[in-house]
Amino acid sequence: MLNIYLKSKIHMAKITRKEVYYEGSIEVDEELMEKAGISEGEVVLVVNVNNAARFVTYVIKGKRGSREINLYGAAARLGEEGDRVIIMAFTFSDKPVKAKTIVLNEKNEIIQEK
């Protein structure tokens, strides 16, 4: 039987920009995506730590090294610049999966990898 497991998590990312009238979703620095094991276009669950909003969207690859986490389109209504979010990707598996997690500081720099 297949179960759904957490496979990747970017913990405590800080929203750097938002734009409501934009085609898109959540843009994540390419380097952070790679470190967390998240692919462009992958569906993610985003949890806003500041306001408890939860939403499902897809990832847009951002500029490598920019440390930007940007909300676009309708998702931009669910967060403000400076809010901290948790970005999670899941997978189907018949066996437990060890999630890859990166923890970020207030500058969206990696301070811990698990």
Curated annotation (Swiss-Prot):
Coiled coil: none
Active site residues of this protein: 25 (schiff-base intermediate with substrate), 58 (proton donor)
Post-translational modification note: Is synthesized initially as an inactive proenzyme, which is activated by self-cleavage at a specific serine bond to produce a beta-subunit with a hydroxyl group at its C-terminus and an alpha-subunit with a pyruvoyl group at its N-terminus.
Cofactor note: Binds 1 pyruvoyl group covalently per subunit.
Keywords: Autocatalytic cleavage, Cytoplasm, Decarboxylase, Lyase, Pantothenate biosynthesis, Pyruvate, Schiff base, Zymogen
One of the record's GO molecular function terms: aspartate 1-decarboxylase activity
Signal peptide: none
Catalytic reactions of this protein: L-aspartate + H(+) = beta-alanine + CO2
Record-level GO cellular component terms: cytosol
Modified residues (Pyruvic acid (Ser)): 25
Cofactor section: pyruvate
Binding-site positions, substrate: 57, 73-75
Location of this chain's protein in the cell: Cytoplasm
Gene Ontology BP terms: alanine biosynthetic process; pantothenate biosynthetic process
EC number: 4.1.1.11
InterPro entries: Asp_de-COase-like_dom_sf, Asp_decarbox
Subunit structure: Heterooctamer of four alpha and four beta subunits.
Protein role: Catalyzes the pyruvoyl-dependent decarboxylation of aspartate to produce beta-alanine.
Family: Belongs to the PanD family.
NCBIfam families linked to this entry: panD
Name this protein carries in UniProt: Aspartate 1-decarboxylase
Organism: Thermotoga petrophila (strain ATCC BAA-488 / DSM 13995 / JCM 10881 / RKU-1)
Taxon lineage: Bacteria, Thermotogati, Thermotogota, Thermotogae, Thermotogales
